[in-house]
Amino acid sequence: MARLRGAGAAGRCRPGRFGSSARRHGLADDGEPDRVLPARRRCSARRRHLVFGVQHPARRAADLRVRQRGDQGGHLRATVRRSRSRQRCAHRTHRLRRWRAPGTLSLTDLYAAASGDFFDFESTWRAVQPEDIVTLIYTSGTTGNPKGVEMTHANLLFEGYAIDEVLGIRFGDRVTSFLPSAHIADRMTGLYLQEMFGTQVTAVADARTIAAALPDVRPTVWGAVPRVWEKLKAGIEFTVARETDEMKRQALAWAMSVAGKRANALLAGESMSDQLVAEWAKADELVLSKLRERLGFGELRWALSGAAPIPKETLAFFAGIGIPIAEIWGMSELSCVATASHPRDGRLGTVGKLLPGLQGKIAEDGEYLVRGPLVMKGYRKEPAKTAEAIDSDGWLHTGDVFDIDSDGYLRVVDRKKELIINAAGKNMSPANIENTILAACPMVGVMMAIGDGRTYNTALLVFDADSLGPYAAQRGLDASPAALAADPEVIARIAAGVAEGNAKLSRVEQIKRFRILPTLWEPGGDEITLTMKLKRRRIAAKYSAEIEELYASELRPQVYEPAAVPSTQPA
């Protein structure tokens, strides 16, 4: 810590350098645990910092640097380190290392310049004011260039205590840090809540290994994006199906059938019968509790899902095995989480209630507006965009369309700018369509529904990378996306899954045609963000030719229709 204090001073972050001339530090996040200490020192020493992911090309990092320049000579100093543990990111990090604009320091440079006597830490932290900007979080850029969200100490403190009031956080609670630190969700759970409540954080450098890490961590509170929950679900189902011990296999099959009954009752909005309650208690004692231990969730008190919609079927599945998950909603502009309910109080299909201390209302066009202590200070150096987002009465226009029930539970319809309005003027939620189809197609990892201004809906489907290897190995097939996208059995299975999903949608929402892309979409790439949000405009532009073929008068090669009568297990 002392070394970092001196390092910060070497970066000219001395007391008195606040306001527009305050020094701003940038941290290039490679997912390694030692990124936390520099960020923590900047939180307590009245320095602003931002974190950007190593997936950003050098020109994006340079653009952020230019946009961060202060009017009175402030500078962004980027600290960049190269990851040796994640070879997939190594070349991208190397590109950032070659980008050494004037005034840029590496952590090595910063440590070398450190002086223990140069910095008065005590007086500096005492000078921190609630409305001082502590960090900048850049939006994902799904609808345009990323914007720097200015968050204050007051924002983050209110967020932490509001989460505690609703969910309950204890000293020593075990959590994981595995999502990108450029995202506020991981920063809140892995850094800010740890500082406020003394949680125990285990950093997992590669998010793809999170399932393997959970049994060692044994988290007591845990949250993830929907795709992680869906992968855990697929892993459980795979384990049950591949159990070689006959007695264990039968016990697992019985317990999972009981869990399925509980899930079905939840989906139907029905109470469990006394018989089912007793049967589930027995299944839990003999099998399900041991399954949770095996997953690492034996001591889990509550679990969350956020950042994107999650299928109700996934939530019901986990509730069935004794892991109730609360779906939450928030955004960087609201300092992370803005709605939540404890899993014991949650309602399936909703994102809970507005956190205590916030005000909310639904505008005439359905957009949800929020006012209160979690609203950001503004977008960095973009007063016009700030004025568009926060009106003169202090209401933040979230861009999300909501419904609310009589008890105050909120349901996200979709992003206001992403609603599908077909040729007949019918409004539809693409997220609802996508979640419904994805729940019936476990081999598909990502899909984008298309239909704005069209007479019917179509979809682009992309494989789940983790499903390809096992599926191909079991059948002796080439595991490449291109080969599987052309395999007749795979096409038939996915067509059956689309038909199954369509059966749960209204006629106008149903997918009439689809194509399976012979590629994978990587988080942080052209098509999806690190938290698996679709970059719809970029996808529409990149795959414009493929999309037009979906609407051709005659069925084109590699364009398919849902199976009229599902004749095989959906993929």
From Swiss-Prot:
<keyword id="KW-0443">Lipid metabolism</keyword>
<dbReference type="GO" id="GO:0016405">
    <property type="term" value="F:CoA-ligase activity"/>
</dbReference>
<keyword id="KW-1133">Transmembrane helix</keyword>
<dbReference type="GO" id="GO:0006631">
    <property type="term" value="P:fatty acid metabolic process"/>
</dbReference>
<feature type="compositionally biased region" description="Low complexity">
    <location>
        <begin position="1"/>
        <end position="19"/>
    </location>
</feature>
<protein>
    <recommendedName>
        <fullName>Putative fatty-acid--CoA ligase fadD11</fullName>
        <ecNumber>6.2.1.-</ecNumber>
    </recommendedName>
</protein>
<dbReference type="Pfam" id="PF00501">
    <property type="entry name" value="AMP-binding"/>
</dbReference>
<comment type="similarity">
    <text>Belongs to the ATP-dependent AMP-binding enzyme family.</text>
</comment>
<keyword id="KW-1003">Cell membrane</keyword>
<keyword id="KW-0472">Membrane</keyword>
<feature type="compositionally biased region" description="Basic residues">
    <location>
        <begin position="78"/>
        <end position="91"/>
    </location>
</feature>
<feature type="region of interest" description="Disordered">
    <location>
        <begin position="1"/>
        <end position="35"/>
    </location>
</feature>
<dbReference type="InterPro" id="IPR020845">
    <property type="entry name" value="AMP-binding_CS"/>
</dbReference>
<dbReference type="InterPro" id="IPR000873">
    <property type="entry name" value="AMP-dep_synth/lig_dom"/>
</dbReference>
<dbReference type="InterPro" id="IPR042099">
    <property type="entry name" value="ANL_N_sf"/>
</dbReference>
<feature type="transmembrane region" description="Helical">
    <location>
        <begin position="431"/>
        <end position="451"/>
    </location>
</feature>
<keyword id="KW-0812">Transmembrane</keyword>
<keyword id="KW-0436">Ligase</keyword>
<dbReference type="GO" id="GO:0009274">
    <property type="term" value="C:peptidoglycan-based cell wall"/>
</dbReference>
<feature type="transmembrane region" description="Helical">
    <location>
        <begin position="314"/>
        <end position="334"/>
    </location>
</feature>
<feature type="region of interest" description="Disordered">
    <location>
        <begin position="67"/>
        <end position="91"/>
    </location>
</feature>
<dbReference type="GO" id="GO:0005886">
    <property type="term" value="C:plasma membrane"/>
</dbReference>
<keyword id="KW-0276">Fatty acid metabolism</keyword>
<dbReference type="Pfam" id="PF23562">
    <property type="entry name" value="AMP-binding_C_3"/>
</dbReference>
